Amino acid sequence: MGDYPFQFPEFSSESLNETAKKFINYLKIEKNYSQNTINAYSIDLKFFFEFCEKEQLDIFQIEPVDIRSYFAYLAKKHEIDRRSQSRKLSSLRTFYKVLLREDLVKSNPATQLSFPKVRKEVPKNFRINETEEILEFESENASEVSEIRDRAMIEVLYSSGLRVFELVNAKLNSLSKDLTVLKVLGKGRKERFVYFGKEAVSSLQKYLEYRNVSFPDAEEIFLNQRGKKLTTRGVRYILNERRKKMGWEKTITPHKFRHTFATDLLDAGAEIRAVQELLGHSSLSTTQIYLSVSKEKIKEVYRKAHPHARK
């Protein structure tokens, strides 16, 4: 789906169409969710609407038993896994939260249903030598503007831990004059500051010299060859092309740089609260998952270095 907004089909009920629009606006404007997240929530809602039409249920009169029936239907027809169930339930809870706020329903029927918590996967990150290999790689066209941009983009991703949607929406006027600090708008429209190291600043400075001459009026920092802002899909494509040129089997994704950023900070002794702030996590528990990665590295060092551990 990439950056392309999901389009709801036109339903027979006009109130249904208006309700869907209110929900999408809430996700987009108030929650500041990425387009990919909005697409996923939209598809979840589409499934639910279709189920309600099929069963002749009124969206505004739904009971908890109807929500249970819906998930039983999904499990039987689509065989969705636990992770998908949890997200679809989250979508419905958010949807009815909006309806409740608009006084369109009396209660939220989705709050009375729960699934066992999905175990969070340990994030995958690059090893230090892998990160260096990606950053130091130079293609045959290293002097081209697009290559200079790509190098700056990768340095920024690793130096700051930005989410990909934060990267593509980053504005030039939110960047400090010395290029070391950037103000970003993250999830839930939460503002935070991220910081760039020497390598990122140097690469960014080189890229901006070209970018500002070619497209001085553009708002976003990272642009395509037509002067339009890069899309999240475009960033993923660029990284995948770099992977191919390097001859790598491993994937290179924006989120992997974010994971590596967090893990490397914790490995170096950074306070977890500071890492939480830099990543823009609202909950410390989200950041704590990186500790398990860091602990595994410590165990590995111990096993290799301690005389008795090697026996």
Swiss-Prot record:
PANTHER family: PHAGE INTEGRASE-RELATED, TYROSINE RECOMBINASE XERC. It comes from Leptospira interrogans serogroup Icterohaemorrhagiae serovar Lai (strain 56601). One of its GO terms (biological process) is DNA transposition. The keyword DNA-binding applies. This is Tyrosine recombinase XerC. The keyword Cell cycle applies. SUPFAM superfamilies: DNA breaking-rejoining enzymes. CDD domains: INT_XerDC_C (cd00798). Site-specific tyrosine recombinase, which acts by catalyzing the cutting and rejoining of the recombining DNA molecules. The XerC-XerD complex is essential to convert dimers of the bacterial chromosome into monomers to permit their segregation at cell division. It also contributes to the segregational stability of plasmids. Signal peptide: none annotated. The active site is at 163, 187, 255, 258, 281, 290 (o-(3'-phospho-dna)-tyrosine intermediate). Belongs to the 'phage' integrase family. XerC subfamily. It is found in: Cytoplasm. The lineage of its organism: Bacteria, Pseudomonadati, Spirochaetota, Spirochaetia, Leptospirales. Disulfide bonds: none annotated. Coiled coil: none annotated. GO terms for cellular component: cytoplasm. PROSITE patterns: CB (PS51900), TYR_RECOMBINASE (PS51898). Its main location: cytoplasm. Residues 121-303 form the Tyr recombinase domain. HAMAP family: Recomb_XerC_XerD. Forms a cyclic heterotetrameric complex composed of two molecules of XerC and two molecules of XerD.
